[in-house]
């Protein structure tokens, strides 16, 4: 909490001065971009850690076991630990349940007003999907977890539909 005061971290993404959340303060992720060699800091190949786990180890494990690691990593980021098989199965089932978009969402939000930029398209989808949530102001933990899970479940859909729209648009 002291770091939040010391670095003047605001709630939310940005304040009027453009300051935002410093990722390192949350201890959810960490990066290594320099190493000490003979008392001197030198650049190194980057290393990324989620909740203390090397992303290389997470990916390596998923590849060795011939499985996808997306849902396991999402669980780790949300809940702070790797899931058991039972927890992962329940989490995956919940994501599957949330992996639907409202009727006409693709047509009205993605197809009717396409953008050239993928990030703008994704941002538009996230902002638009909020209008379908009747509990946007509920900041209780269960509701925020639900909202996070819905975003985790639907975000890949936004990217796929937007990419498909761009591909089909180029063929016209």
Predicted features by range, described:
Residues 1-172:
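Hydrophobic alpha-helical bundle cores within soluble ligand-binding/oligomerization subdomains
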